[in-house]
Amino acid sequence: MISVIIPVYNQADKIGRCLDSLLAQTYRDFEIIIVDDGSTDHLDEVLLDYELKLQKAKIPYKIIVQENRGANAARNRGWNESQGDFLLFSDADIFWRADALEKLVNSLMRNPQASYCYSSFRLGRKKFHLWPFDPERLRREPYIHTSALIRRQDFPGFDNAIKRFQDWDLWLTMLEQGKGGLFYDDFLFTVAGGGRISKWLPSFAYKLLPFLPQVKKYQEAATVIKVKHRLPYDPK
């Protein structure tokens, strides 16, 4: 079974499309764990409507409400409450292609040496084609997103102290533990446009757009990751 874990903070206007895309999946052996990380919008009303849809579709689910503790803490809470052999962390502003879960789980089943499987994605109408798994590239830049399918037995948990580049930190930690990934060469999900663009900004943009305030913050955060994992960095 796959546990789809969705941390949510004030995204009542986005999560419906995410849940609709999960309801439409061709692969049906999954549960949904929603972690409301202290939202102050009308998320509870939206989720009440979707509880009926999930029950009708016979999809197991949990809705967890906690005080705002940040994305990593919400993801870890969902992980601790989940039951699946595979984990998929989906942000609320993502909607999935109908065969996404099927493609990801089949890829991992055919490749037992891989601990996780990731794909390319779209940000609004723009395509972001990622690269095959490469440990050296991964040490240089954060090119693998959080929304990969992960074997539960290989997942070490997120570091709650890390506020940015949580995905890079996770994959580097797993790499240090001898665990690698697998690239599925297709676009399996779309990130809704109009949100916090820096959250999904590709790593190369940090070098091209250094004047943007959010990019500067992410450059500083990248240094934190490099220091933690003993990677080369520019101390300037």
Report each predicted region and the residues it spans.
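Conserved donor NDP-sugar-binding/catalytic core segment of glycosyltransferases
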Residues: 99-131
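Cell-envelope/extracellular polymer assembly enzymes that use nucleotide-activated donors
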Residues: 1-3, 31, 169
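A conserved hydrophobic helix/loop-capping motif in glycosyltransferases and polysaccharide synthases
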Residues: 2-14, 18, 25, 35
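Glycine-rich, basic loop-to-helix element that forms the pyrophosphate-binding segment
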Residues: 66-82
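Short aromatic/hydrophobic "clamp" motif used to bind/position activated sugar donors
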Residues: 87
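Acidic donor-binding segment of Leloir-type glycosyltransferases
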Residues: 19-65
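Catalytic beta-strand/loop signature of glycosyltransferases that borders the donor
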Residues: 120, 182-188
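Acidic donor-binding loop at a coil-to-helix junction in glycosyltransferase catalytic cores
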Residues: 164-172
